[in-house]
UniProtKB/Swiss-Prot annotation:
Organism from which the protein derives: Nocardioides sp. (strain ATCC BAA-499 / JS614)
Annotated coiled-coil segments of the chain: none
Record bears the keyword DNA repair: yes
Top-level division of the source organism's lineage: Bacteria
One Gene Ontology MF term: zinc ion binding
Disulfide bonds: none
Protein name, per record: Recombination protein RecR
Gene: recR
Record-level GO BP terms: DNA recombination; DNA repair
Length: 199
């Protein structure tokens, strides 16, 4: 244990995802030894991100504007909608350059053990988007784990009465994995080989 604000800094850094106690300590000591101007820039950027970044009013991707660049892009196919769990999944799919439609970010996955049901996700907003008839295909690009599969199954049942083409990403993604960690080739192949969600 360190004194006062040093320990406070280590504790706060340790709350970040993927940063353990030793990593938090290394980052804290790096910041203590860094040039004050560099630390100020980091602090300013953190505050600026919290102040300026919000969620797109259409798809719920991160954006500095009311609508994200993907929703504003007239070259994107408005008839195909890719449903993902988190905004970081949008980045992973965009890296493949295989998908030219639009997105809908649910904000998580159904996980009863964590107290997350359909009501906590942006499923209501998804149904509103589908109501105008512009979208003809929905790609369910949830993580290939238990929660992702539960979410995809739930959505498939919800979407069936709408008579849309509902597809899932093809295999090739490891079960139990997260989309954001898939390499571009694997994710690209999974996109190209997607299948009907009813199969």
């Amino acid at each position: 244990m360190y004194e006062g604000v040093v320990q406070d800094l280590i504790d706060e850094l340790g709350r970040l995802p993927g940063v353990g106690p030793k990593g938090a300590q290394r980052i804290a000591f790096h910041l203590l030894q860094a040039d004050p101007a560099d630390v100020r820039r980091l602090a300013d950027v953190l505050l600026e991100v919290k102040a300026k970044v919000k969620f797109c009013s259409i798809c719920f991707n991160v954006s500095q504007d009311d609508q994200c660049r993907i929703c504003r892009d007239p070259r994107r196919d408005p008839s195909v909608l890719c449903v993902v769990e988190e905004y970081k999944d949008v980045v992973a799919i965009e890296r493949t350059r295989e998908f030219r439609g639009r997105y809908h970010v649910l904000g998580g996955a159904i996980s009863p053990i964590d107290g997350v049901g359909p009501e906590q996700l942006r499923i209501r907003e998804l149904m509103v988007r589908l109501a105008d008839g512009t979208i003809t295909e929905v790609i369910l690009a949830t993580d290939p784990n238990l929660e992702g599969e539960a979410t995809a199954t739930y959505l498939t049942r919800m979407l069936k009465p709408l008579e849309l083409r509902v597809t899932r990403l093809a295999s090739g993604l490891p079960v139990g994995g997260d989309l954001e960690y898939a390499d571009e080739v694997t994710l690209g192949r999974a996109f190209a080989g997607r299948r009907s969600a009813d199969d």
